[in-house]
């Protein structure tokens, strides 16, 4: 009986040490993740988590989700806004093809990818996306935002900006 008690104590001690090391490792990885303040980023004068004014937008009936509704700009058809139904807050902005839509970080569709890095900095993760596209992904852990700049042949093709 005493031998069984000693073995259990060693097993419990070992499990405690392993779980402690895993927690420390996880916290270290989380702390060292790159983060950028994206709270001031605007696309077509729209910010995430602001109340949405749909006066210049038409409802996109092709995309249907339970908690969200999507709008397309009347003038810029490739500018799509994802809006939370309950609070009517902007939760996503997607821009494709329209080269004239403004961003406050001075990047447009068709610009060189170097312009993105010059204006937003080097705290990004590089990612491969389907059909030969690459992406620069900027994360804002404090505000729970993610800005993805998709590019092909060093030319910006798509801008996606989402919030939780």
What are the residue ranges of the model-derived segments?
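N-terminal Lys/Arg-rich, disordered targeting/topogenic segments
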Residues: 1-9
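A cross-family detector of function-defining hotspots
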Residues: 35-40, 47-89, 99, 108-164
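Sec-dependent signal peptide cleavage junction
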Residues: 24-41
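N-terminal glycine/threonine-rich, aromatic-flanked beta-hairpin/loop signature
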Residues: 94-96
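Hydrophobic membrane-insertion alpha-helices, especially the h-region
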Residues: 10-28
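N-proximal short alpha-helices
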Residues: 28, 89-90
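Acidic/proline-rich low-complexity IDRs
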Residues: 2-3, 45-47
């Amino acid at each position: 009986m005493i031998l069984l008690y000693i073995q259990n104590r060693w097993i419990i001690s070992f499990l405690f040490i392993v779980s402690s090391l895993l927690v420390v490792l996880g916290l270290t990885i989380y702390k060292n993740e790159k983060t950028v303040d994206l709270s001031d980023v605007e696309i077509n004068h729209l910010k995430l988590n602001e109340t949405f004014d749909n006066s210049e937008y038409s409802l996109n009936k092709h995309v249907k989700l339970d908690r969200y509704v999507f709008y397309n700009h009347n003038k810029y058809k490739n500018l799509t806004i994802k809006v939370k139904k309950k609070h009517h807050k902007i939760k996503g902005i997607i821009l494709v093809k329209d080269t004239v839509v403004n961003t406050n970080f001075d990047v447009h569709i068709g610009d060189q990818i170097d312009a993105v890095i010059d204006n937003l900095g080097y705290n990004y993760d590089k990612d491969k996306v389907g059909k030969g596209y690459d992406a620069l992904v900027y994360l804002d852990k404090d505000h729970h935002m993610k800005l993805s700049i998709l590019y092909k042949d060093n030319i910006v093709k798509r801008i996606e900006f989402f919030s939780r």
